[in-house]
Amino acid sequence: MARVSGVDIPREKRVEIALTYVFGIGRTLSQQTLAATGVDPNTRVRDLSEEQLVAIREYVDNNIKTEGDLRREVQADIRRKVEIGTYQGLRHRRGLPVRGQRTSTNARTRKGPRRAIAGKKKPGKK
C-alpha cells in the first residue's frame, strides 16, 4: 500500500479519490496536488510509478497541512476561542451548534441523545 502523510491510501482507487483518505485533503486539494505534480487523476494508485508517488508525497508534506498538524491546529483554535470567551467558544463549551443552527428541534449530534424530563403530572382518578 502507498503511504502519504502516514496514511495508507487504497491501491484499487483512482489517485484523485485515494488522496482524500488523508485528513485535510479533499477533492479540490487532491486535484491541485495532482496538477502540480503532473500525475493523471484517473490513474489507479497501484499503477503509479515510484517517482510519481515520491512527487505526490513531497508536495503534500511541503505544501499542505494534514493529519496530526491540522488536528492540533483546529483544537488550538477551539481552545483559544473558549479561553477568550467568544460566542463561538461559549457554544463549544456548552456542546451546542456553533454556526447559528437552530436548537429548538434538531441539533441531536451536538446535544447527544435525548434526556427524559418529567412533564406535567396528570391528575389520578380516585
UniProtKB/Swiss-Prot annotation:
Listed InterPro entries: Rbsml_uS13_C, Ribosomal_uS13, Ribosomal_uS13-like_H2TH, Ribosomal_uS13_bac-type, Ribosomal_uS13_CS
GO molecular function: rRNA binding; structural constituent of ribosome; tRNA binding
Residue ranges the record marks as coiled coil: none
Keywords: Ribonucleoprotein, Ribosomal protein, RNA-binding, rRNA-binding, tRNA-binding
GO CC, one annotated term: cytosol
Stretches the record annotates as Disordered: 91-126
GO biological process: translation
Keyword Oxidoreductase listed: no
PROSITE patterns: RIBOSOMAL_S13_1 (PS00646), RIBOSOMAL_S13_2 (PS50159)
Compositional bias segments (type: Basic residues): 108-126
Origin: domain of life: Bacteria
Listed transmembrane segments: none
Family: Belongs to the universal ribosomal protein uS13 family.
Subunit and interaction comment: Part of the 30S ribosomal subunit. Forms a loose heterodimer with protein S19. Forms two bridges to the 50S subunit in the 70S ribosome.
Protein role: Located at the top of the head of the 30S subunit, it contacts several helices of the 16S rRNA. In the 70S ribosome it contacts the 23S rRNA (bridge B1a) and protein L5 of the 50S subunit (bridge B1b), connecting the 2 subunits; these bridges are implicated in subunit movement. Contacts the tRNAs in the A and P-sites.
Protein's name according to its UniProt entry: Small ribosomal subunit protein uS13
Organism, as annotated: Streptomyces coelicolor (strain ATCC BAA-471 / A3(2) / M145)
Primary gene name: rpsM
